[in-house]
Design a protein with these regions (language model features):
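Active-site-adjacent loop/helix segments that line or gate small-molecule/cofactor pockets in enzymes
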Residues: 1-24
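Glycine-rich loop-to-alpha-helix module at the N-terminal edge of alpha/beta enzyme cores
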Residues: 37-119
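PLP-dependent aspartate aminotransferase-fold enzymes
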Residues: 81-187
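Active-site and channel-lining beta-strand-loop segments
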Residues: 19-41
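Adenylate-forming
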Residues: 6-7, 48-50, 132-137
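Short beta-strands and strand-loop turn motifs
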Residues: 40-43, 187-194
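Active-site core of PLP-dependent enzymes with the aminotransferase class I/II
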Residues: 173-179, 191-210
């Protein structure tokens, strides 16, 4: 779900202030295991502010789908309908690929990008999961990704051959990005458009032009 892995919790919540687990959620409210009520202004607050937890209309649709059977050997018509809707919203794309997680979606995007670029090296900004291509940034220096959401990401098990194939730059630091592109044969730029910092000095326009 949208709450991420519990292994990330120590980096995001203060002990003894915010609970580890919930027993119930409704609207913007959550209850811990001791039935204490909280307003959720945390990770999932973006979702809860739009429709809220346990939205009656969504619950009704989910229950209906479960009763019809939500898994089969065949694909569901909803998959086709959603793909059709997405390509109508974004006519520049003629195909849709669904993924189960954000990390998987990023890995797919990187593979497609590398397949279509002569220069395979990547300049990256922000957090993009735990797949080898991303974590390889930390092979040379385990602190390279410390300013990109989660500190101390472990690279044990990541092939050492991936060293010096992906390079990190900080948001709004266009000069570093431009330098990387010149020195490291960068063919792909992977970044979050915005997280908690607004772009400055036409940063996004400069990146697109680059």
């Amino acid at each position: 779900g949208g709450n991420s892995l519990i292994s990330k919790r120590p980096d995001q919540f203060i002990d003894n202030i915010w609970p580890c687990y919930y027993s119930k959620s409704k609207g913007i409210d959550i209850w811990d295991l001791d039935k204490k009520k909280y307003f959720d202004f945390s990770n999932m607050s973006v979702g809860t502010n739009i429709l809220g937890y346990s939205n009656p209309k969504i619950n009704s649709s989910v229950i209906k789908t479960i009763k019809l059977g939500n898994m089969s050997t065949l694909n569901s018509k909803e998959e086709y309908s959603l793909a059709k809707r997405l390509t109508s919203i974004h006519p520049e794309f003629d195909m849709v690929k669904f993924a189960r997680t954000g990390g998987e979606a990023n890995a797919i995007a990187i593979r497609i990008a590398r397949a279509n670029r002569k220069n395979k090296n990547i300049a990256v900004c922000g957090y993009h999961g735990w797949h080898d291509w991303y974590l390889s940034v930390n092979i040379k220096n385990k602190k390279n990704l410390d300013e990109h959401l989660i500190k101390g990401l472990n690279v044990e098990g990541v092939p050492k051959q991936l060293k010096n194939t992906v390079f990190a730059f900080n948001y709004n630091d266009f000069e570093t990005l431009k330098s990387l592109c010149k020195r490291k044969n960068i063919g792909i730029i992977k970044m979050e458009v915005m997280r908690n910092i607004k772009p400055k000095n036409n940063f996004l326009k400069k990146v697109r032009k680059l």
